[in-house]
Amino acid sequence: MLQDHGVTHYEEPCPYWHPDDTLQVTNALAINVTGGEQDCDMRVWKDMIDRRIVNIVQPDVMYMGGVTPWLQVADMADKAGLICTPHAANLSLVTICTMHVLQAIPNAGPYLELSIEGTDYYPWQDGLFLGDPFKVTDGHVTISDAPGWGVEVNPDWLATADYAVSAVGG
C-alpha cells in the first residue's frame, strides 16, 4: 500500500528500543525501512546491521558522539551491503557535519535529511550561520569547501546566545 502512494521508505516505524518489532515491519514491507537515528551503542548497531533489522541505517553524527563512530557505523553498513542515509534533526552543525561526512562514504543514500521545522519549532537556529549553507537548488545542496566545516557562525547570533557551564560530579 505505501509503495502504491509513492512512499519509498518508512523511517523508524517502531520505538527504537524495540528492534524485533522493527524487524517484523522490515520483513513485511516491499519498501525500505530505515532506523537508528537515536542509537549510539555500537553493539546495537552491530545487531541492527547483522540481523538486517533495517534496510537503511540512519546514524546521527551528534547522537553518535562525533565523526569517528559515525564513520564506523557507515563502514559496518557498507560491508553488509546497506546504504546510509543519516539523520540530521535541525539546521545546525548536525546537518553541516552530515553533509561533509556523506562525501566520505561509498554507501551514501540518495537523500540528505533537511529539517522541515522552522523557527517556531527550533527558534535558536534562526540566523545561526552567515549566508545560507542549506540553500536547495534544483533539489541539491552545495557543500562548502571553505575551511573547517565550511560555515561561519553569525557573531550577532553568538552575542545573544545564553552561556552555561556544566560539570560532572561534585
Where do the PLM segments sit?
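Shared catalytic-loop signature of beta/alpha-barrel
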Residues: 3-9, 15-140, 144
